[in-house]
Amino acid sequence: MRFNQYSYINFPKENVLSELKKCGFDLQNTANHKDSLETFLRRFFFTYQDTNYPLSILAADKKTDLLTFFQSEDELTADIFYTVAFQLLGFSYLVDFEDSDVFRKETGFPIIYGDLIENLYQLLNTRTKKGNTLIDQLVSDGLIPEDNDYHYFNGKSLATFSNQDVIREVVYVESRVDTDQKGLSDLVKVSIIRPRFDGKIPAIMTASPYHQGTNDKASDKALYKMEGELEVKLPHKIELEKPQLNLVQPQGKAELIAEAEEKLTHINSSYTLNDYFLPRGFANLYVSGVGTKDSTGFMTNGDYQQIEAYKNVIDWLNGRCRAFTDHTRQRQVKADWSNGKVATTGLSYLGTMSNGLATTGVDGLEVIIAEAGISSWYNYYRENGLVTSPGGYPGEDFDSLAELTYSRNLLAGDYIRGNEAHQADLEKVKAQLDRKTGDYNQFWHDRNYLLNAHKVKAEVVFTHGSQDWNVKPLHVYQMFHALPTHIHKHLFFHNGAHVYMNNWQSIDFRESINALLTKKLLGQETDFQLPTVIWQDNTAPQTWLSLDNFGGQENCETFSLGQEEQAIQNQYPDKDFERYGKTYQTFNTELYQGKANQITINLPVTKDLHLNGRAQLNLRIKSSTNKGLLSAQLLEFGQKKYLQPYPAILSARTIDNGRYHMLENLCELPFRPEAQRVVTKGYLNLQNRNDLLLVEDITADEWMDVQFELQPTIYKLKEGDTLRLVLYTTDFEITIRDNTDYHLTVDLAQSMLTLPC
């Protein structure tokens, strides 16, 4: 384990003493260090009647147990303090470590022995081996009462609200959209779990079209075959109009009553970060949105009608929209328990909705935590004039996603009444998708949140993985740079795939978000501020660094690609084409081994480099015909240890999100030997070589100069490493699978790779 502590806040000594005293640690500034440590530990072991016993089973050094040490005349030393501290954090002395000073350096332990009271205070705010901070572990065990009131420690809310005796209710928010054109505003179901409190509380809202269930069968039927010819497009410039949103006004009157009438029973799934905040005094709201089970309307996937309906839930929390008790719309309830302040959470589609919501500039949305979210839907299902698939999901497109999330069809009555209209709406979507050309058009323009990024007022926290080929890093990169300069923005850029990171051992992500939301949503005045970029170092396990920016580097490193011309044959023998199509993983393996139709260029790294931003290929290239698809991957090549893209469980159900509440696995990205690691990749239709909105002819056997930016990333390379650039045509995981007989030729002498460093 390595400690990477970003959540700790330096407080004045009087605040430290006061907070310790409120938790029963009655330490005196004038007492000697040894007496203070003993006083602290006897309170620490509050679950024991006889505190001599737990002291006797800890060690002060290799020859002395802690009780014997306190009974002796020996002085407290730094070595003894560290030895005790590590044991309190769950490490076994003489098993996990033998020399506390060596272990302190190996783990990056954040505490330097000196002022013992401040050391003990920070120790309570440090994560244990099993994932909780020490103070959270003690509170979970009953250190302070579960009194349904707020208690703070180091600028963070503690788990002092019951997670068993909570209010569970359902309301139906009246949206300002009518997606199915029935003349009534769509209703959106809101599932609420909130602690009991005599006052107003903030809300954590997860906008998830998946929450009410998914129609996997219908979605699978809507998948496309990726086999087909790359379209030869007519040259033209793409014209666009400013997206428009037509809102509807509330209709009719409804009796105001005091409480919701529908009780929330079981929910499909909760998000463990939300679970963590519930006993800390934050309401949990789950909203599936229009076109989902128990709501009304069509599934409009990603457009501002869908976003508006989610926004209207925040409006209701602030008294600007109505919520009914049921679908009759006869009775309404107010969110009189809400303080109007909201944060959004969730990954993938959920993080996408956070991005979209932020761009409305809605009042009350204080913070978004957008994890692996889409910033422009074109870049999810298309790339540079090509029809593409999200990584791992060949053949998926917008209509299959709509079928997946239109969970109203899971209710037989809704299916009978509404499926015909839903299918008609889906046909309109299919026509607008334009799978023929892969070009950007008005449909995608209406789902591009970057156009409204200037409206964002909320503080923004992103998480994204360098190995996320589902929602690719370009999404967070573009959103990060499109935000107004005056707002606070932060990015946790890890080396995983399309995954959550709130339960990783190496970083205090939950606690950092607690500090932020306690400040922004509960009004606690602290100077807590996350760094702009928190980056997971790819060269070592469990190592995180603060950076000033993502991209924007002034310097670059250029690699020449060679001296000759090389060709990429597009067509495969039928047997190989069929084999790769059945299992794209086989294609990826053979591509990395140099066995596919490809140009492979090994580039020695002659000095330490820190890539930060978008690698760019400048290529002199020609096609043997009037079309061309170019794929590129940049690898770090060579057998060595690399961080793996998916977290592994270190210990099962050891993270407590409250008081024995929703126990969670402790995880981390493994660091183990592999033959290579993908650094970045990209795909380009050569007819869109100069601009996404400009389609140009390709003249057979005529040289073209192409600038081709790959996916943004942050990656450290060391002198002696090897980069491998792979250029090829069809990518059997991502692109259309065109097996026509043509080839691309690259003049390597007139081509280069540029890395921003």
UniProtKB/Swiss-Prot annotation:
Matching InterPro entries: AB_hydrolase_fold, Galactose-bd-like_sf, Pept_S15_Xpro, PepX_N_dom, PepX_N_dom_sf, Xaa-Pro-like_dom, Xaa-Pro_dipept_C, Xaa-Pro_dipeptidyl-ppase/CocE
Gene name linked to the record: pepX
Name of the protein in question: Xaa-Pro dipeptidyl-peptidase
Function: Removes N-terminal dipeptides sequentially from polypeptides having unsubstituted N-termini provided that the penultimate residue is proline.
Residues of the active site: 348 (charge relay system), 468 (charge relay system), 498 (charge relay system)
Assembly and binders: Homodimer.
Swiss-Prot/TrEMBL keywords: Aminopeptidase, Cytoplasm, Hydrolase, Protease, Serine protease
Source organism of the structure: Streptococcus pneumoniae serotype 4 (strain ATCC BAA-334 / TIGR4)
Listed EC numbers: 3.4.14.11
Domain of life assignment: Bacteria
High-level lineage: Bacteria, Bacillati, Bacillota, Bacilli, Lactobacillales
An individual GO BP term: proteolysis
Reaction(s) catalysed (UniProt annotation): Hydrolyzes Xaa-Pro-|- bonds to release unblocked, N-terminal dipeptides from substrates including Ala-Pro-|-p-nitroanilide and (sequentially) Tyr-Pro-|-Phe-Pro-|-Gly-Pro-|-Ile
Subcellular location: Cytoplasm
